[in-house]
Amino acid sequence: MPHTIALILAGGTGSRFGSARPKQFTLVAGRTVLEHSIAAFEQSEEIDEIGIVVHPKHLDEVRDLLRQQPHPKVTQVVAGGKERQDSTLNGLRAFLREDGTLKNPVERERKSTTSPPNSAVCAPAGLSSGKSPQATEKSPLFSAENSELSAETPQLFADNPQSATANGEHSTDNSLLSVDSPPLSTDNPPAVRILIHDAVRPGVSRSLIGRVCAALRSHAVANVVLPVVDTLIEVDADGQMRRVPDRALLRRVQTPQGFHAPVLFEAYRRALADPDFRATDDCSVVFRYCPEIDIALVPGEERNLKLTYPEDLTVLAHYLTQPLP
């Protein structure tokens, strides 16, 4: 079975939300938005590990959150980058080598001298045996006896030296540009699958996660979509109406998006060679830079809406008080 990693991107600042705090830390239905998203992947039998990518200024807040409510599958908390694509790459590099294969626990070790006391440390359970981390009564991630680092034990939740500078600002690593590209192949099951999810979609369900993983059995990439119900118009640079697209041919995009790890790495390797590259989602990177890859379209869910405006909280509170499908 492939090893499946969920990357939860929680690095946004929420400028449209109109709050001093990033919206992923907003309370709704008794928990933060981020906690709701983590819980859905934690409860999915398809997911082996979870990584959280967060703005460098909020690393400690996420660590504290996870100490209060441990999630055994969360094995990495990583500093995000300046742009969305930088955050994705930082998250991928926390788990994977540049060829898309899984790092072993020693390779994951972080020796950051800036980490706060009691940073969580543990070897991700089951990496050597291929099994997923298992929940225990007392999670090893936050126990006092694990506060000392050793050569055999990777430091998790450490500041990522590749993604945050000494003053807390972002930096960008383009090392993928120097990696030789192997031929893309989707014939065999991948050793590693990656699901990438926006933290501010807390209504994601276990059934949706399962459908994305099912699509990855026959496709290298899976995108989550919904039909467009409103009429849309296209405008020009001056804001003047120019065209009315056929909405029957349009879809709204959601997350989680799923990938065979080597395919996603190759898409980003090609993208980083483009000086005009900028991504708003990861499937679009594959679509643009790896056009030879067929992308599966998975039906999304209305409950999986993206928290964007304060008014969305009322709708999300309704969904989040209902049992997850």
PLM segments and residue spans:
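Residue-level signal for inorganic ion chemistry
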Residues: 8, 34, 91, 197-198, ...
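Short, flexible, basic/aromatic active-site loop/helix in glycosyltransferases
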Residues: 234-259
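Conserved alpha/beta core of the MobA/IspD/sugar-nucleotide pyrophosphorylase nucleotidyltransferase superfamily
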Residues: 82, 251-325
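Conserved donor nucleotide-binding strand/loop of the catalytic core
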Residues: 71-82
